[in-house]
From Swiss-Prot:
Belongs to the shugoshin family. Residues 167-178 have a biased composition (Low complexity). Residues 42-77 form a coiled coil. This is Shugoshin. It is found in: Nucleus; Chromosome, Centromere; Chromosome. Disruption phenotype: Viable with 100% of viable progeny. Defects in the regulation of the synapsis checkpoint and DNA damage response in meiosis with an increased rate of synaptonemal complex disassembly in late pachytene meiotic nuclei and an increased number of rad-51 positive and hus-1 positive nuclei in meiotic prophase. Reduces the number of apoptotic nuclei in the syp-1 mutant background, which is indicative of inactivation of the synapsis checkpoint or the DNA damage response. RNAi-mediated knockdown results in chromosome segregation defects during meiosis and mitosis. The keyword tRNA processing does not apply. GO terms for cellular component: chromosome, centromeric region; nucleus. It holds the Pfam family Shugoshin_N. Component of cell cycle checkpoints, which ensures chromosome segregation during meiosis and mitosis. During meiotic prophase, it is involved in the regulation of the synapsis checkpoint, which monitors whether homologous chromosomes have synapsed, and the DNA damage response. Plays a central role in chromosome cohesion during cell division by preventing premature dissociation of cohesin complex after prophase, when most of cohesin complex dissociates from chromosomes arms. It comes from the Eukaryota. The keyword Cell cycle applies. The gene is sgo-1. InterPro entries: Shugoshin_N.
Length: 309
């Protein structure tokens, strides 16, 4: 029996429908980027290996040097040990000082740069205006004849008066010198004479000066002394008061002696009472005309008793 006949007899076999399955996308690996990252890691590891080998060699060399120093310290004497220790410490100190010096130089350079920046900030900004002086313009003006210098009339008169006064004074001195003997007077150191001679010489000199000062002049000389006020009239006679005595007699009479004995009264001298004693207010008795004061708390002999309860 063929398949076709069987299919026609029994009917067609229904085929099961397959569900569409979700296809999982395969991961796309970028082999180039992965290889680059692995190559970089490999290079870093190689560099670390090289550094580690260098440090290992350095530590080995230091270990050998320390063993040698230790052996020298063990084998050497006390003085050699001290010298080695001092030398080692000096090396450490010098290395430390070199590091400090390098840091100090760096700090100085940095502060210098900062100060330069501050000074540049503080400097005034150049203004856009032109600070140069403008060129001087030459003025072609006509020449004018100037007026000659003239002094004021008042100043000229004062100068002439001063000159005239100087001439007059010189003439007066020359006339004084020639008036006595017709010859110039010489200054001589003369000793002190009597008062009468001094007064006579003074009067003669004053008369000669008055005669010499009466020389006629064309112009009035300047006034060297301020004009005094006008003289007042004759003063009226005033009646003189009688002179007052300097000391007054005391108003209180002297006390009489109290004892009857004449001998005692003659020997005892009683001082008279002062006049100022009567003016002392504390010695005066209170007058009965005024109202008396009410006694206080501390008055004696009867104390103050308050009767108002």
């Amino acid at each position: 029996m063929d398949a076709k006949t069987a299919q026609s007899i029994f009917g067609g076999i229904v085929a099961a429908k397959k569900r569409p399955s979700k296809e999982v996308p395969e991961p796309t690996i970028n082999f180039k980027s992965a290889n680059d990252s692995l190559v970089k890691k490999n290079l870093l590891l190689k560099q670390q290996v090289v550094q580690c080998t260098k440090t290992i060699e350095k530590l080995r060399n230091e270990n050998v040097a320390l063993r040698q120093k230790n052996q020298e310290l063990i084998d050497g004497t006390l003085e050699q040990r001290i010298e080695l220790i001092v030398e080692q410490r000096l090396k450490f100190r010098l290395a430390h000082a070199a590091v400090l010096h390098k840091k100090l130089v760096q700090n100085i350079q940095q502060t210098g740069l900062e100060l330069d920046g501050l000074f540049k900030d503080l400097e005034p900004e150049p203004s856009g205006l032109n600070t140069r002086r403008p060129p001087k313009l030459e003025l072609n003006l006509e020449r004018v004849d100037e007026i000659p210098f003239c002094q004021s009339s008042m100043q000229g008169e004062i100068d002439e008066n001063e000159i005239r006064f100087d001439n007059n004074s010189s003439q007066s001195t020359s006339s004084i010198q020639n008036a006595v003997n017709g010859t110039p007077r010489k200054k001589q150191s003369v000793g002190k004479g009597r008062r009468s001679e001094l007064f006579q010489s003074f009067n003669a000199d004053s008369s000669i000066v008055e005669e010499a000062s009466t020389i006629p002049t064309n112009r009035r000389a300047p006034m060297l002394i301020a004009p005094s006020s006008t003289p007042a009239g004759p003063s009226k006679p005033t009646a003189r008061k009688p002179p007052t005595p300097r000391f007054k007699k005391p108003s209180t009479p002297a006390l009489a002696p109290q004892s009857d004995d004449t001998e005692l009264s003659s020997t005892i001298q009683v001082r008279r009472q002062r006049s100022a004693k009567m003016n002392i207010k504390s010695l005066k008795e209170p007058s009965g005309k005024d109202k008396l004061r009410r006694p206080g708390k501390h008055d004696e002999p009867m104390p103050y008793i308050n009767t108002f309860f």
